[in-house]
């Protein structure tokens, strides 16, 4: 579980935990900026500066905004209804939710959620480990009552940052059903024509390397 903080000027930061200074033993906050950070650099600052009241008029410099965590499979019914209006395909909502009990991508994926600090789920995204260095992102959805508030964007930035913290060479792929513009903000580009296999979606890739690795048919299957 990771907490996202909002700076008093509006920027978002993902905390990775705390560390101790090797000489003074002073507590340090370890975090990643979720903006203007193409190399996914980690930063540290004394915890006293992170959690103090150094903001305007004595307010908090950083305030807890939301929590990112992995979703357990047995919690799935809490989020599956989020996608019903987009992917229901004429089924009842109960039929739609029931279908995921045998959906291979749902069962093999690791979902992440963005929650309020009191546990209300706002957005979710599924991650599929396709190779050691490639993750497919799918099923990005927000609770209908909380849409158009930037929650999915925060979750995408956070999940990509966490996975690149694990592996700096991580490449991400996805199939966009909403065009390319939204996902370009996360560094995605339209994949070359040989990777475009589905009429109603656009295959996209985001790689840290200037030369993305071979996708080797990874985008032939819709996920």
Where are these regions (language model features)?
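Mixed-charge, low-complexity intrinsically disordered regions
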Residues: 1-67
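A structural microfeature
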Residues: 17, 122-123, 192
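Short amphipathic alpha-helix that is part of the acyltransferase structural core
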Residues: 66-99, 106-115, 120-121, 208-223
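Conserved beta-strand in the GNAT
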Residues: 113, 119-129, 133-141
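A short, internal acetyl-CoA/4′-phosphopantetheine-binding micro-motif in the GNAT/acyltransferase core
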Residues: 140-148, 178
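Conserved acetyl-CoA pyrophosphate-binding loop and the N-cap/start of the following alpha-helix
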Residues: 146-158
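Conserved active-site alpha-helix within GNAT-family acetyltransferase domains
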Residues: 168-170, 177-200
